[in-house]
Each structure stands twice: as structure tokens, then as C-alpha cells.
Amino acid sequence: MADTTKVDVLVVGSGPAGSTAAMYAAKGGASVMMLERRSEVGTPVRCGEYMPSNGEIVKMFPNLTDEGSLFDIPSKLVCRETLGIKLVDPKEKITLLDMPGYTIDRDLFDQYLAKCAVEEGADLVTRCAFDSIDGGVAKTTEGDIEYKVIIGADGPGSRVAQSLGLNRNRNPYPAVSAQVKGDFEPYLYMFFGDIAPGAYSWIIPKDGRANVGVGCSPRFSEGKVTDYFDKFAEKRGFSEHTRVGGKYVPSEGPVSKTVSGNGMLIGDSAGQVISVNGGGIPLAMIAGRIGGTVAAANIKSSSPLEDYEVQWRRIMEKPLKTAAFNKKLADMFAFRSEWSTRFCMNVLGKRRLNKLIRCQSLFP
């Protein structure tokens, strides 16, 4: 890369949010550069690798339109279709929720989205870390990049957010995962209790293997999240697994503002994550499509970047704020002990647990 590169839209981060934004910005006619600080897109894998079906996504976000084109991924990227979710309380009582979905290999999925962005005309630069902004110029480890619009898709600790003067996520919680071999039912398992204080541990089935992991709230946990993972793996008989990878997950809903000047935040950097379960891939892609489209329109016709704020909030704000409120209720009442977790799950019952997982108000 030259000492100073000029580009219409600079996207920082090549996850689902960044790649989708880069794809739609390029599709809209803008010159686009996408930065990835690692040597390869999608690695290491640090998430649960689960996607709800298109129908379930629309149930959660009823204002979403044209979801088919956004989530139309090749069948070869689908590891396994799942039939539902089994919620397991501290005494192993199971509540089955009918919620179809599918699992993916996150590295291959991310690489596919990045390839789509490149095919639309975006430039992908790996081994390039964003540092700061100086008057419309991004300072990176590979030189300066002059841009017209910058999109921060660089996760909960977003440097882009900091550089734009926007709030970053408060109190994200750690989560770790690994892969294990075996034959598993076509259901996602979520385990609650002391095995994962303030959050849950999971088994997500794939093809002859599973993604297993643990998330913990620092407010309730008394040790490292990796220690809880080891206990969970031992309890479930996972004596052999791949290397454990981790990340931080936003847990308090979207940040108050996602546009500032000629910059915007999308995905985890904007807190666009479902607080009650940590899910974020579909939301990242929804926000990425909006952000990339709005950025291209800004370049082409000077339409305001604030259109992004308006559009994503119309689709996602209410469900995300409802999920964040439900998470606060869980922190206040359910996660105080294993007894309170069991009690609250029994009181809520299957109907309200269905609402909880789908970002809906629990009452009435």
C-alpha cells in the first residue's frame, strides 16, 4: 500500500458486518477498501456459529424486508440444519423451543462474505491494523488512508468508535468456544447455572462435531472464563477438543449513537447484539447492508449518513432494547443463584421463554 491511499469508503474489520458493508458500498458504486488486522479473514473462530432461519429472523425483526437476498448463502456453507433450542436448567430440566436454524463454519462463512465484497470491487487488505483518525485520514500500520466515509466494524473495543468520539460498549462479557468431535442431536443446547454464571454454556451441533462454549458475566463469575469452560467440558465428557478461542460480547444493547461526522459503527462495535443470547451474525449483516448502501449514497448524492441511524433503528432498536431489558431482569432475579435460575425458568414457562429468546416483551 502506498504511503497515502485515497478511497471513498474505508471499512475497518472484515467480519460479517464489515464484509457486508463493503459489498453493498461497492455495489453502490463507491471505491471501497476493507482492512483486516489478521493475516486471514475469519480466523481464529471465536463464536457459536449458529444462524436462525430466515423466518425466525423476521419474527425477531418484523420491519426487516428482503431478507432472502441478504441471507441467501450457498448450501455448501451450511454444516447442519437444526430443529430448535433446548434450554437446560441447573437440575437438567429441559424446555424445548421450536426455533429452526442452521450452523456454519464461521471461518468459511466470513471468507465467503469477504469474497463477495471483493467480487463487487472492494479491495481487501490483510495484516493492516487501524490506529486512529487525523482529519479525514486513517492512520494504519501500513500507511495513511484518506477516506470520505469510514465504517467501524472492529468489534466491542472499537478503535474507530474511540476516534470518532462515539461511545463504546460498556461491560462486555467474555465467551470462549472450541470444536469437539461426535454425533449430536439437531438441537442447540443452552445450559444455565453455576456452569456459566450470568450467561450460559452451549453445545451447537455441526456435521460430526459440535461447537461448545461458555459465556460468563464478570458480575457473577469468580474465576476465568476458561476455567468455567474446562469444568463444562469435563462435565459433558469432552476430553478432547480443539484450541479454545475467546472474544468479548456486548451485553447492554446498542450504543446511544452510531453516526458521527463522516463515520459510522456497525455490528458488535455498535452493540448490535442480542443481549439475552449473544447472537449477532444476522444483525451484523442487516446493519452492514444498510451502512454500506447509505455510505455509497452519501458518496454519490451527498445524502446524510444519519439515514443509517434512522434505518437500522427502525428495524432493530425495539427488539434489541427489549432483549437488553430482559437481560437486566435476568441479572436482577434469575442469575443470583442456581435456585433463582430454576425458579425463574419455571415461572416463565415455555411460552415466555420463547418470547425471551426472540427479543419479545415477557409481559403480558
Regions found by a protein language model. Give the residues of each.
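C-terminal helical "tail/cap" subdomain of flavin- and related membrane-associated enzymes
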Residues: 293-364
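FAD/FMN-dependent oxidoreductases across multiple families
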Residues: 220-294, 299-300
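N-terminal FAD cofactor-binding segment of flavoenzymes
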Residues: 24, 42-85
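Glycine-rich FAD pyrophosphate-binding loop
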Residues: 14, 26-46
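Beta1/beta-strand and adjacent pyrophosphate-binding region of the FAD-binding site
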Residues: 3-17
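Glycine-rich phosphate/pyrophosphate-binding beta-alpha loops
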Residues: 46-49, 103, 200, 270-282
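Predominantly flavin-linked oxidoreductase catalytic cores and closely associated redox partners
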Residues: 28, 40, 116-239, 255, ...
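Short beta-strand to alpha-helix junction loop
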Residues: 95-116, 217-224
